Amino acid sequence: MARTPSSDRPERGRGGERGDRPNRGRGGAEQTPREREESEFVDKLVHINRVAKVVKGGRRFAFAALVVVGDAKGRVGCGSGKAREVPEAIRKATEQAKRNMIKIALREGRTLHHDAYGHFGAGRVILRAAPAGTGIIAGGPMRAVFETMGVQDVVAKCLGTSNPHNMIKATFDALINLASPRHVAAKRGKKVGEIIGRRDGAAAAAAAGV
């Protein structure tokens, strides 16, 4: 039986025809909707420590992890997990953070709409909106929240505690109190332009020292 001439065979590029297939995941399989959703999130490990439980036979040691997860577009959540191994504790904390995510409206996609205050336990936090180019001026645990949320310019300060759990929860308490001009206008029955005009006027007066 005669062989087919090489000139009649279909040409194959480097790596065959696989490069033309979109959404290829690990192992050459297409990414599932869950995998694409998880790839959109940014997670940061804020704190991990070893804990012990006293039982009849002695002490049982485990690890507790605190994780912050966000999509860099205004959504952010925090969670804690405990397990005998560090990776499992981080996985549990990450899953809990994804379930506890909240949506925060950002001004110009980079900062907060207005100043906010929050507290949890002995911790109190102050969040201030900042002009472009300021950057994230905040302590470690709070910085992780803003970075995963997508905030680029903010000034934050924590008072009364150095416990990362209290700092994170106080920060979320402040974020929940934020409201966009559209939400405030709808609540007061006014136009968005009136709310923005008053906000800008108050900011200019504060800058002038009036």
UniProtKB/Swiss-Prot annotation:
Superkingdom per UniProt: Bacteria
GO MF annotation list: rRNA binding; structural constituent of ribosome
GO cellular component terms listed in the entry, alphabetical order: small ribosomal subunit
Alphabetic keyword roster: Ribonucleoprotein, Ribosomal protein, RNA-binding, rRNA-binding
TM segment ranges: none
Chain spans, region Disordered: 1-40
RNA-binding in keyword set: yes
Residue ranges annotated for the S5 DRBM domain, each copy included: 41-104
Gene Ontology process terms (BP): translation
Any Pfam family: Ribosomal_S5
Ranges of compositional bias, category Basic and acidic residues: 1-23
Notes on the domains: The N-terminal domain interacts with the head of the 30S subunit; the C-terminal domain interacts with the body and contacts protein S4. The interaction surface between S4 and S5 is involved in control of translational fidelity.
HAMAP family referenced in this protein's UniProt entry, alphabetically: Ribosomal_uS5_B
Function of the protein: With S4 and S12 plays an important role in translational accuracy. Located at the back of the 30S subunit body where it stabilizes the conformation of the head with respect to the body.
Similarity section: Belongs to the universal ribosomal protein uS5 family.
Quaternary structure, from the entry: Part of the 30S ribosomal subunit. Contacts proteins S4 and S8.
Protein known as: Small ribosomal subunit protein uS5
Organism (species): Paramagnetospirillum magneticum (strain ATCC 700264 / AMB-1)
Lineage, opening ranks: Bacteria, Pseudomonadati, Pseudomonadota, Alphaproteobacteria, Rhodospirillales
This protein's encoding gene: rpsE
